[in-house]
Amino acid sequence: RLFAEMTALENVMVGRHIRTKSGLLGAVLRTKSFKEEEAAIAKRAQELLEYVGIGKFADYKARTLSYGDQRRLEIARALATDPQLIALDEPAAGMNATEKVQLRELIDRIRNDNRTILLIEHDVKLVMGLCDRVTVLDYGKQIAEGTPATVQKNEKVIEAYLGTGGH
């Protein structure tokens, strides 16, 4: 969850603080190393806002951003931790078509930067267009796994999600 009353920049900085070395004492005493580290964190946070396409909103409160921009802010904050794996749970939920295109481009960019992405998503078009491997669940039970092309031809998947199934 975003901190609604904090700026976009501050939200990303929160994510980066997991990597700090100064500690509480440095923060309380406002030591030189703490100030240098904070400046570096702010710089990296701004870079991440640019990376996800919302750099111009750095000083905007999170609550004022559009729904799609809030999702990108969440992704920037997650990236601030320098994860090996980034899990995205329903990132396209509630997005309009334009926001979904932007999301797809961002996820593709993250993937091309050699980050592993675990995408949990019901938007079949988005999943099939982005993922190298797909695992399909129906009511919590795995019904298919493989490449998007293989999964799309699976009868159980067609019945549950792509065809005339009950979902």
Q: What spans do the regions from the language model cover?
A:
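Glycine-rich phosphate-binding loops of nucleotide-dependent enzymes
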Residues: 1-167
